[in-house]
Amino acid sequence: MPAVMVYAIGGGLIEVLISPILEACPTDNKESAMSLLHSFYCWGCTGVVLLSTLFFALFGTSHWKILALIWVLLPTANLILFTKVPIYSLHEEGESGMSISELFRVKVFWLLMAMMLCAGASEQAVSQWASTFAEKGLHIQKTVGDLVGPMMFSVLMGLSRLIYGKYGEKFNLDRFMKGSCVLCVASYLCISLVPVPIVGLIGCAICGFSVGIMWPGTFSKASAAIKRGGTVLFAMLALAGDLGCSGGPTLVGFVSSAFSGNLRLGILTAIVFPVLLLAGLCTFSRLVVKNVD
């Protein structure tokens, strides 16, 4: 348990720091760069699922400690790379960032926090249960379920972020995010209401594609709306997102358990998160227009 807590803290710090590091880089299209950055989270998840599943298939789950030692190579490589990477400041020379108390007094900040919570919940409410859904729906082993469920979700989510990262200058971020929310709602309905297992599994993959832009897109919107937010802003948004990542799957689990393990009903309940995110985006758009006027 202490080891889990320590690596969770380490992973959280990387998540908090790497987004503002990229935001400070002198790139032309920061929204695209942010999306491209977060696509590598998906490729990492895909690689971990694929390689870990392969390892367990070859050597058995009893050798999990050896696998943990092998994965130590990744944070070690990150440690070395971080010593080489030039880090720019988020603020102009002579400009200071906001304190937490200043940030808390900005009204749009709380809207962005709610949007991040919904983004995290929309993503993980399906992702965390994708393997179980595949196992129960298709009656397959856990090994195959891990490959078919979470890995397919991660690949499609990464593809969505890669597309925006490559062609972001051709898209309007606001419209892209709103369209993704609508697609996410459709995928939730497909998973929970269509009684054909393979269709539900396709819905899981579509959900992965739809949630791809939600997290990095909200980061980009926040950075543009709160210029002096700095690392504190990214840290608070990451906190809200992580709360959503925990709360979304928990809600699905509670509802499913209350209705005799009905996972479809649990996922249907979680549809509230992409709906609320869409409402938040519409409200955010009105606030931005009002401030410009």
Residue ranges and their predicted role:
Residues 4-39:
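Cytoplasmic helix-loop-helix junction between adjacent transmembrane helices
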Residues 227-261:
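A late C-terminal transmembrane helix in Major Facilitator Superfamily
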